[in-house]
Curated annotation (Swiss-Prot):
Catalytic activity of the protein: [(1->4)-N-acetyl-beta-D-glucosaminyl](n) + UDP-N-acetyl-alpha-D-glucosamine = [(1->4)-N-acetyl-beta-D-glucosaminyl](n+1) + UDP + H(+)
Glycosylation sites: 395, 488, 799
Gene that this sequence comes from: CHS1
Entry's induction text: Induced by the antifungal agent caspofungin.
Source organism of the structure: Cryptococcus neoformans var. grubii serotype A (strain H99 / ATCC 208821 / CBS 10515 / FGSC 9487)
SUPFAM superfamilies membership: Nucleotide-diphospho-sugar transferases
Keyword Glycosyltransferase in record: yes
Pfam assignment, any one: Chitin_synth_2
EC number: 2.4.1.16
Membrane association type: Multi-pass membrane protein
Protein name according to UniProt: Chitin synthase 1
GO biological process, one term: cell wall organization
Amino acid sequence: MSSNQDVPLPFTSSRPLPSRQPTTSRPGGTLKRNKTLTRPERHVAPAPLVAPPTQSFSPTSPLPQSDGFLNIDWWRLWAYATTFWAPPVLLRWFGIKEKQSRQAWREKIALCWIAVLLGGVVGFVTMGLQRALCPADQQNQSMYQRLGDTNMTLSISGWAFNISTSITQSNVDFYSLANQMPGQDITDLFTRSVSDYPACTSSLAYSSGAFCNSTSSSSGTSCVLSSMSQETFDSLQIQNTSLLEGYSWDQVAKLENYMVIDGYVLNMSPYLSFNPTAVEGDEVDSIIRHVLSNQTGSGKDATRLFFNRQVPQDAVGCMKARYVAGRIDKITPGCFVASFFLYVSLVVILAVVLARFAMACVFNWFLSEKLVKPVTEKELGRKGINPTIMPEGANVSVNNKLGTAPWAGGGGAAEGKGGGVGPGKKLVNGKKINPLSPLPSPSHSLPNAPLITLSQIGPELFTVCLVTCYSEGPSSIRGTLESIASTNYSDRRKLIWVVCDGMITGQGEKRSTPDVCVGMLDADGRFGNPVPMGYEAVGSGQKRENRAMVYAGHYVSRNGHRTPTIIVVKCGMPQEATEKKPGNRGKRDSQLILMNFFSRVTYNDRMTPLDFDLFRKIWTLMGVTPDYFEAVLMVDADTRIYPDSLKHLVNCMHHDNMIMGVCGETRIANKRQSWVTAIQVFEYFISHHHVKAFESVFGGVTCLPGCFSMYRIKARKDGDNDWVPILVKPEIVNEYSQSEVETLHQKNLLLLGEDRFLSTIMLRTFPRRKNIFLPQARCRTVAPDTFSVLLSQRRRWINSTVHNLMELVRVRDLCGTFCFSMQFVVFMDLVGTVVLPVAICLTFALIVNSIITPPKSFEEAIPLMLLAIVLGLPAILILITTRKVVYVAWMLVYLLALPIWNFVLPVYSFWHFDDFSWGETRRVEGEIRSKGHDDSTAVFNGTTIPLRRWEDWEKSRLRKLRREEKRRKEMERQFGAGFHGDPRLGGDLRGMGMGERPWARSEYDSDNGSLYSSEEDMWGGEVGGYNEHNPAFPPPPIALPPTDDPVSNINGETLGMDEMAAILDSGFDDDPQSQSTYPPLSHPRPHAHPPPPPISRTLANAPSPVRRHQHEYNAPQPRFNRIDSPSFGSGPNSARSSPHSADAGRYAAGEYVSIDRQDTNDLDAQMPHSGGSVSSSVESRPHGVGHAKKRSGGGAGIGAGTGARGGGYGPLGPLADVNEVGRGQTRGYGGSGKDR
């Protein structure tokens, strides 16, 4: 088969093409249309947030839009329109010289204008809408007295008077009038003059007629009572009730000669008495007579007729003053609209507030408790996809039927079987064996079947704990690592992954951050000194390329935990050596090192040298390949997690497969350090237990904080038959790794709030999956203790919140519908964030106004009720959820600081929309303040970093080892065993595996089918100068228990207890001086070997990362060191060369299984036969029931070559020195040495 095996073969058959299948599903069926509406290819993927979509022929890609009117950049035009008064010359004169900075400034002004407009709208709706639609003279319904409802009352000029104590007059009987109709109008009984009505200046009839109308005379000229003054009222003993006389529309319709203008009821009887006939040419008279004669059943409202023309409109004021009898006491349309809006606002806001409160309580009480329960045996008993099976869309050869990863078959790098890829072996006829065909695996320590029971993985998922460091000090970093290592989570299932963001020394620190981190590592000596490995970073211009060194070992906690640890130190390119912060690319780049690595592992995509180096070291440290990891915990370097937090988070992932991200509660560790930390305590609490708890009910937590959040790397599908990449999905990784950002919106998304932006991307990509909050998982972090640092931190948070909510509000697939949806809640959060300054000002105005003029009605009290509910419910939530009264005191402190939270911080943030720096948050020694507008003049012309798949990197690694071995043999033939740099004498090549015992030979060592011969492979320098399979070190740990597959037992026979005891007796030597640290010969597959705990040592004598960085670029190392050069090997000369003498009991107890040595022959000459010794493995059995299995055949002996330095390691512990037990014999792996 040709090397282009992934290319589909052309159709060359002479048979005709198959005919079309029948359209009916069964005989006699009917013709039906297929379910075209459910075709997944018709789903339109969301457009990227940052980079525009590229041209693609995928049916899921959005259709390209043609250039036209709709493609105009309206936002850029709006930015220029709002800043037309600031030409570029003026901005350059004020110091804004870069084009990007000027554009960012214009966009900032445009956003501030929008914030001001929204604030104005909110202010008008809150304070001005009521006054505009319902003036003060129309809005108070309690000022009215309805006509006919109150006895012993009459009205004068629209006001109700009490006549119960009045003196009876000879010409007017007040009591008789009140009995006829309580409240009727008696204004025309009083004497009035023109001076009483200054608005009546016209000569028309309505203004110049008589003022009086006698009840006993029809002449209309006599007035029975004196003028309307307080003296007259006192003499008549009638009292003004200060209530307006109210009329209903029905009453006005029934009353003769009454009509309405603009809500005023007018008694036109005096006018008609004085003008019994129509006045010729009088437009006002015509309207009056038309309304009174033609609208007898409709309330006689003349408002529209009077306001249509100028002359009648001028008469309105005079007519209201002269003929008023009362008011319409029904609510006016304006007041109705204002009241309706007020009540709708009350219902909506109250519903949202109460719903948030209720759902937060329900989640804290019930839902979260279910998520943290231990995983049951029933859940672990179901079948699931094997972690070594790659997801759909991965790079899988056409012959790989199961889709297994190339490193998964049979055990990994040393074999390349069972789905692995390698050069293959030639047959006699010259054809190659198909390297992807499933071959029998000699190892059964890991499950090989496509579907496995989840119990084989166990309740503890393989988890990466990512710690991103920048300029933190030793105490912060050690506290974080100590808290992770001390969690009640197995050290075999967690990997601490530390990323140091550049060669940086924090302000006030004596050592650089990389030096601090590496100094805490108990390094694994097999990896030697790391070399810088290239990778593609986040940056512009030449910053797109970067290099990093990978330190591997264990972090040893105070309570004895030995946790596998990887430290990635970003050291930068050679030209950065003289810069202030070489290698620094930001926190997002640190996260993307991990995300890109696991994405390439998941899809078998092309790897950078850094990825391959990480792959090898993780495999060696953990005993499993990286594709076994399913979750990643992201923690900041100043955060300390609680001991049970990691287990709670993983249990949450177990119970709900739809959860893609989960965060815990973050508490403040320095709450009493200053007033700045004190005002943050309640804010942290309420943002988690109120906001995030409510969002968790919908599964849509909009911000998973970067200081303490767990993401799912990949999830099993509902049918457990395939993987769904989550965090490492290419769409997420590509969008999160954008380097070229131009607009202010993009920079706020990517440069300030990378954690929130990652949550936004995941919710947009997987709107049906969940981001939740888990209150049982807790951590403590150090909050800003000075106001300047708090100001800088909240500026980043507020600005990133605004821009991320602007993107989330456009996601239509979030949970819920209309007002009962997560999208509506996001919209309210966005508006609420923008109008915070206006809201706090209106709040104080409301409080002051309520104190000066207390509310007199329910409607006036509604704003105060809302304010009390919004501020009071959190206190109730505290008592319900935590039952800690002390948080009520912290709430009072928070309320006192409301002007800071809602006015000072937002206003400062909005005005600094164009500042993309971290400000005062993390200062570096010698750092110069930058706003993030660095316009790099260098152009990224492509990367020099090689990208190759794992198979190709592995071939290059093995070829390099072969070249080094060939070179060593040649040197030995020329100069003898003691030549300069001989690795057996402590030379530099010990890190390459050139110890006393060479490594195992592998079928990867063949050059068949390779593009390069072993001497022409150009990638050796990118592999790394170490051999993780160095037999001078213990094999990797057993990460998974052996499976119960019966196939694994076909090569052995059961031994009795006596025979087992004899084997154990013959496998050890009681002389402690003869014990050695060398393992058996051959490279084991890392997950197929029983490990004693790895021999490790610190890098106390090694150069620091900073010095190492300078050393690598300024002084190249010679190929061979002096004979007396120090070595990183942990042999007998090491101070801790034999720490494993007590491990035999652990082997005997069944904690480790035997090392299978099939196909691991030495590259050197054949070793002497060891006789008939037996390799045995001890299974984990109850006490007294154990048995062992006798292995047939054996690999090469390990006796030869070990006599000079001592023994090696067998499956049951340290082997005795061959000088003690006989020349050429071994204890452990037996066999003739040629059976395999």
